[in-house]
Amino acid sequence: MKKKNAFGTILIAAGLIILAGAVSMKLWAAYKQKAMLDAFQTTIQTTETSVTDAGSSDQNTLGVLEIPKIDLTVAIGKDVTKETLKYSVGHFEGTALPGEKGNCSIAGHRSYTYSQFFNRLDEVSIGDIIKIKTSKGTFSYVVYDKFIVEPSHVEVLNPSADATLTLVTCTPIRVATHRLIVKARLQ
């Protein structure tokens, strides 16, 4: 009987440790996200009179992505490294900057623990508005397409003739065998 009780106690303790780890990761991600947003806001306030480029801050924050339809406001990191995507969405280096001619491409994770920024991206519809705030201003995009591709179909990141926005995330959430793509045009 004592062995069963000890085994049960060990299982409960292990479960609590796993749960505590998941909660702490989520809290840490929220803290890092707030720090990025605060740093970006400080940059905007200090550079309002002289702005040289969209990524003028010394921080890793390019701007802020807002999707009102899904109540999302998230910092945009300047790259798509594993570290950046833990705490924000990220801008694919080599693609257009927000508001510029070309294809501004941004990636974000969907998960059950941390980095849940694009969990509701599948709820975005054609005609919805997506906003990006940078040190150069606020840019509004209108969604014109949404589709799913294989992970190898990287042509969705190719340059475009117009100022467009491409949001990329894994789908479905649990197995992530494909990529959900949301395309939008600058208004």
List the model feature ranges, each with a label:
Residues 5-187:
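Solvent-exposed, non-transmembrane regions of membrane-associated and secreted proteins
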Residues 1-2:
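N-terminal Lys/Arg-rich, disordered targeting/topogenic segments
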